[in-house]
Amino acid sequence: MLNKRIGIDLGTANSLVWVAGQGLVMNEPTVVAVGTEDGRIVAVGNEAKEMLGRTPGNITASRPMRDGVIADYRVTEAMLKYFIQKVCGRIFLFKPEVMICVPAGVTQVERRAVLDATLSAGAKAAYLIDEPLAAAIGARLPIAAASGNMIIDIGGGSAEAAVICLGGVVVHKSVRVAGNKLDEAIIGYMKKKHNLLIGETTAEEAKIRIGSALVLDKPESMEIKGRDSITGLPRAIETSSTEITEAIRPVLLAIIGAAKGVLEETPPELASDIIDKGIIMSGGTSALRNFDRLMTELTGVPCHVAEDPLMCVVRGTGIAIENLDLYKKSIIKR
């Protein structure tokens, strides 16, 4: 097969690229650095992420995806072009077929924008798959079966809860609250409680290192550095896992609210399947310590984190593009 088939999980925080027959080939932050004067793309991915919050006046580093959908069309197109060129080389004779996953709750206009950006970036054919379906395929759930499966995919920009049966989404709810909002909650908490201004990267590091959805029996602590909001001078403080838990709790409750909303609307026959099988959690944010325990407590349904949760969506997208005939019911083509 001369033309490559590529699956892309274009996330708000990270973008992952899967090539049919090769597996995962790229995992880079969804960040693009743009020159403010001429609008040219300066850097993409890891290189641009290092520039977040540190750029000189003539460059801005921004995230082209907001809440799981395209916020800046031109920059998203440049990002897709960068991924396609990295996989196929700068000059390619055979245009690749590209599949992108999108949140199930996006509008037709937003879907069209993703398809157009993909074709403009150099794809021969563009396909879309709903994120919960891709996550379910990647988590190896039997999506074509006549029994219900429930998955909640919690990424950087949005959390998607869905019940899947017979290869389609039966009920879904999407909240534009996820990993990024956890970081924002930590930033807001530090400012309010300690008068300390910190950046996105610092907040994310605290969330990953000492964050927990439930209060830990043995609290952990770490040093956080930032700028004092009163004196304006650099300052470091010691923060504990208990503080991080307190800061992120409202966001976690909003995510769990989406799961509850789906359970309330699920047909009784499928609800009984879900009670037996439980809810599968995927996406980077589901790896937060004790999040599955908190969700089990609040929904009353056993929750399990999928194996390798960060990879579920991109693996599912890759499997779907490798087996287009098998999943044609679940895909939109352009």
Question: Where in the sequence are the language-model features?
Answer:
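Nucleotide/phosphate-binding catalytic cleft detector across ATP-hydrolyzing
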Residues: M1-I154, A162-I280, S286-R334
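Acidic, divalent-metal-coordinating active-site segment for phosphoryl/phosphodiester hydrolysis
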Residues: A159
